[in-house]
A protein has these predicted regions:
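A short beta-strand segment in extracellular, disulfide-stabilized domains
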Residues: 418-420
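Extracellular, repeat-based ectodomains that mediate carbohydrate processing or recognition
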Residues: 1-416
């Protein structure tokens, strides 16, 4: 009997990218319900601040001339450029949160509730020194004075990440508390935190005993955290610049999806249907012709529908961008469809043969990924040969990751013609 039944069926799929016209570094991104895409552009805002670039009419466009990108961060007193630029869009309220780390000495948050037309803040997010590798998310856990709870985690002077919560939408922040169980020795570096529909927050990194990867969960608003070990016995774990990271996302029903790089530098995936308490057997999700991958990120839509973003190489010294899609992750034999977002003669990096294993051009430490309201994944990347240009990789054709599995409406091919 064929396993290609139900939602586990093939769709014609093709990848492309669209250049934004702005350089980037560690390109985090978000999408609002008005179909605007936002991403960070290091140093290109007013007075040398981090720009928050808004791309309009890119989602569901029919012609390349439809979309445009511009900076929308322009407060009267802009915050100085961030050492680690970061933007996050609250999926439940559309609040655009700009989260800046300043020379390892502290962090500020600013936000916009009107698509970047006006900005509130900055507010001080921490009173401690030596802060790095910050990450922020929200969930409908419910703040006391705001409809969503906000949590950030950082790498500080502690054996595990330190995390803080805001009950009022980012105006004030509670004390930084350990983001792991007592006596955890995971180190402070971790992947991005995410908030689930059921109010849980998750963050992936090295296990408390210093081995493997684990998922860390809080169900009480970042007061306490529990460790949930991922099934890395077969895959092993990467030994690269970002080896500490296990990426995570949740679907519309709060099922949990984890992604990490194995000791073969290939991407692996597992899911949990019980709040990270147990995990499925891990599977490798990258195409077999790749010899190595890096900068993993995962995003989920409705249950079983998940996309993975990463860069990869065939061993020829150049690196490309990839999106792998699964429309029925719970199938005994899930079909994995992978597209390359750039043409073979248009690599995303051709200067470093080990780009995916190190801090590399505009990729920095990480990339980001989101799903729009139509079920299409968007992957924020850097086009290093053109000067670290921020680009949005996506599917011109392929399956939707929301609702019944059908074909996405086609988008025009982008690529190098959008770099001009």
């Amino acid at each position: 009997t064929s396993f290609l039944t139900g939602e586990n069926v093939p769709f014609y799929s093709q990848g492309t990218y669209y250049a934004t016209g702005y350089s980037t570094f560690e390109p985090t991104m978000g999408i609002t319900s008005t179909d605007n895409i936002y991403f960070t552009s290091y140093g290109n805002g007013p007075a040398g601040s981090t720009a928050i670039v808004q791309c309009t009419n890119m989602i569901e466009m029919t012609s390349l001339s439809d979309f445009s990108c511009q900076n929308v961060y322009g407060p009267f007193l802009p915050v100085a450029n961030s050492n680690d630029p970061y933007v996050y869009v609250d999926p439940w309220t559309d609040r655009i949160m700009k989260f800046d780390m300043h020379a390892l000495g502290g962090m500020t948050v600013e936000w916009s509730d009107d698509e970047g037309d006006s900005w509130v803040g900055p507010s001080l997010a921490t009173g401690y020194s030596v802060q790095d590798h910050q990450t922020i998310a929200s969930s409908p856990y419910g703040g006391i004075l705001h409809e969503t709870l906000w949590v950030f985690c950082i790498n500080g002077n502690y054996p595990a990440p330190l995390c803080s919560a805001s009950q009022d939408g980012g105006l004030t922040w509670g004390p930084e508390l350990p983001g792991a169980p007592v006596d955890c020795q995971s180190g402070g570096l971790s992947a991005h935190i995410i908030g689930a529909e059921n109010g849980n927050f998750y963050r992936g990194q090295i296990g408390c005993d210093g081995t493997g990867y684990s998922m860390y969960k809080t169900d009480d608003g970042a007061i306490t955290w529990t460790e949930h070990v991922l099934p890395t016995e077969v895959s092993g774990t990467a030994d690269t610049w970002n080896a500490e990271e296990a990426q995570v996302d949740t679907d519309s029903e709060s099922n949990v999806y984890a992604m990490w790089m194995g000791n073969d530098n290939m991407p692996y995936f597992s899911y949990s249907l019980d709040d990270a308490n147990t995990w499925s057997e891990a599977i490798m999700v990258g195409p077999s012709h790749l010899e190595g991958t890096g900068f993993p990120v995962v995003i989920a839509g409705d249950p079983g529908k998940v996309a993975f973003g990463y860069v990869g190489t065939e061993g020829d010294g150049v690196w490309h961008g990839y999106i792998s899609v699964i429309t029925d992750a719970f199938s005994p034999s899930p079909l994995i469809t992978t597209v390359q977002v750039n043409a073979p003669d248009d690599p995303l990096d051709n200067a470093s043969p080990t780009c995916g294993y190190e801090r590399c051009g505009g990729f920095g430490d990480f990339i980001d990924m989101q799903i729009d309201a139509y079920g299409r994944p968007w992957l924020s990347l850097s086009h290093n040969p053109s000067g670290d240009t921020g680009i949005m990789g996506t599917l011109t054709n392929g399956p939707t990751l929301l609702g019944n599995v059908t074909s996405l409406s086609p988008l025009p091919i982008g690529g190098t013609q959008t770099l001009a």
